[in-house]
Amino acid sequence: MKRTYQPSVVRRKRTHGFRVRMATRGGRAVLNARRAKGRKRLAA
């Protein structure tokens, strides 16, 4: 059986990247929450 996670840098960036997060209000909320928590990496 094929595994569900087949990594692709392009797909990863397009769905979870910084630019995508910044595009929507909810995404910006995610970034702000991660900043408040002190995350080293904000987005993929």
Swiss-Prot record:
InterPro entries: Ribosomal_bL34, Ribosomal_bL34_CS. One of its GO terms (biological process) is translation. One of its GO terms (cellular component) is ribonucleoprotein complex. It comes from the Bacteria. GO terms for molecular function: structural constituent of ribosome. Gene3D superfamilies: 1.10.287.3980. It holds the Pfam family Ribosomal_L34. Keywords: Ribonucleoprotein, Ribosomal protein. Belongs to the bacterial ribosomal protein bL34 family. This is Large ribosomal subunit protein bL34. The lineage of its organism: Bacteria, Pseudomonadati, Pseudomonadota, Betaproteobacteria, Burkholderiales.
